[in-house]
Amino acid sequence: MLLRDLVLRHGCCWPSLLLHCALHPLWGLVQVTHAEPQKSCSKVTDSCQHICQCRPPPPLPPPPPPPPPPRLLSAPAPNSTSCPAEDSWWSGLVIIVAVVCASLVFLTVLVIICYKAIKRKPLRKDENGASVAEYPMSSSPSNKGVDVNAAVV
């Protein structure tokens, strides 16, 4: 399809295309006639001859040598037979005790704050619906002051 489109677009290509198609088989025949017959079968007979090229193909190049092993960048370890001094376990114990004590202090403060928040008296509603806080240190109920949130009627 592509070849037909190419040929139809360019009308001048017909002669070169026909020449190519005619000479292509001849070129293959010329290549075959320049080769020598070689007997390659186990039984040597006239019917068992194959056409091969005169020279054998060149040998393959040898494979490249393997890469050298990687070198270590770190210094070699010292050949010491004595054991290194062990770190004291007291420093780890001190850190653990400090973390536990800090956690206990935090939890105690948290419990105290929550206890005081629960014990505090809730807000009571005034007669007109405004919220008034009751605190233990406040004045007696007979001594009522003017509420700031109270609406004047």
From Swiss-Prot:
Residues 56-70 form the PRAD domain. Coiled coil: none annotated. Isoforms 1 and 2 are expressed in the adult brain. In matured cortical neurons, only isoform 1 is detectable. Pfam families: PRIMA1. The keyword Nucleotide-binding does not apply. Residues 1-35 form the signal peptide. Residues 59-79, 133-153 are annotated as: Disordered. Required to anchor acetylcholinesterase (ACHE) to the basal lamina of the neuromuscular junction and to the membrane of neuronal synapses in brain. Organizes ACHE into tetramers. Interacts with ACHE, probably through disulfide bonds. This is Proline-rich membrane anchor 1. The gene is Prima1.
